[in-house]
């Protein structure tokens, strides 16, 4: 093995030590760490943009479908996306109502059940930001099950740019996944050519892709 690319899930410090002790270049995709090169997005700013889109559509009662608070991996992405959501609410002077938050584990199945729970609560939101497209798909499925039309009765926005988002007509924050992989590979090749090169972190932009799952 000449190099190692680690995607999404953050290694523990012990795992980092083991990888770096291999003496080969290591690059992270989807997260940052000061000890090696990385390529990622700004999850906080991107989530703020997604939430601002809902605010711009006139929504004031905005819900959040976030990752599990008891995540055993202590993954920073759900926390950062929640932080961006909260920042957008605060910047627009909107009250945060804790009962408008439900949790999934970034799968369609758990998101669908979480959305069932949210829609059964009083004073339900008129829009919801889902921290992933997979969870947004589950939310859309549950909304239909409750006799709600998306976006007429509730607006839903996701995050990631899943390949099925276009077919589901889902508004989403799209990550440049292919470019992230290309830049990680480029970073690895640079370190192979110049082993003494310092690790560096790249932050790539995301794109708000507006489709028909959000409306005023």
Task: Please provide the spans of the model-predicted regions.
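Residues lining the SAM
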Residues: 7
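Conserved phosphotransfer active-site motifs of two-component signaling proteins
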Residues: 11
């Amino acid at each position: 093995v000449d190099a190692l690319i680690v995607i999404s899930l953050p290694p523990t410090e012990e795992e980092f030590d083991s990888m770096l002790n291999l003496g080969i270049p290591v690059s992270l995709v989807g997260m940052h760490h000061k000890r090696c090169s990385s390529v990622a997005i700004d999850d906080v700013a991107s989530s703020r943009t997604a939430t601002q889109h809902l605010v711009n559509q006139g929504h004031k009662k905005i819900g959040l479908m976030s990752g599990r608070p008891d995540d055993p991996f202590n993954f920073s992405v759900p926390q950062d996306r929640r932080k961006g959501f909260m920042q957008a609410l605060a910047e627009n002077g909107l009250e945060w109502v804790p009962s408008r938050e439900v949790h999934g584990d970034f799968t369609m199945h758990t998101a669908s059940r979480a959305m069932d729970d949210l829609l059964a609560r009083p004073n339900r939101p008129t829009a919801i930001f889902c921290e992933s497209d997979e969870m947004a798909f589950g939310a859309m499925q549950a909304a239909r099950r409750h006799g709600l039309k998306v976006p007429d009765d509730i607006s839903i926005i996701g995050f990631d740019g899943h390949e099925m988002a276009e077919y589901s007509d889902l508004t989403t924050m799209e990550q440049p996944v292919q470019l992230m992989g290309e830049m990680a590979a480029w970073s690895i090749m640079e370190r192979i050519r110049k082993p003494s090169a310092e690790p560096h972190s790249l932050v790539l932009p995301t794109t708000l892709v507006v489709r028909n799952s959000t409306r005023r």
